[in-house]
Amino acid sequence: MPIDLLTRRAALMSLGAFASVGLAGCNATPTAGVQPGATPPPGLRIGVVNIDNSPLVAYVGNPTAQWAQQALPGALAQAFGARMAPGDPGAVPLDIRLDTLYLGNGGPADPDRMRGVATLGGHSISVRADSTYIANPTDQALPEQALQGRVQALAVAFAYRLKRKLGA
């Protein structure tokens, strides 16, 4: 009898561990922040980030446009790191207008896409970002979190694409 009990306990513990690991992947991705004591490298310094998502609201509606607006500042902080200087009076403001966001059907044949225009120091830069989505079994159970994760991945791709275009 103790052998059967141990086997049941082991089965229940492994099932519980498997369920918790599966649900842990559904947590929202933490946004990156700028370290307060970080000294910016010489050159480009970005001050205030203004995001205009009104064209995106008209294109895809809420909550998708709101997710993009919320995810982009953290993605920019992750991509630009110490070049973000929100309190620096000499830093240049970055204005971003998000125009379109398309969530594809998945895979490399139909990637997710985000397009917008970034204005930095009076110069406008057209930015296009792509992100490949691979379906996950938990996406069917938690579709809203899956869509939000895809928008966050697009925001990160957008930020790094902007960084590449700026040469920073």
Regions found by a protein language model. Give the residues of each.
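N-terminal secretory signal peptides and thylakoid transit peptides that target proteins
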Residues: 2-25
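Short secondary-structure boundary motifs at beta->alpha junctions and helix caps
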Residues: 57-62, 66, 124-165
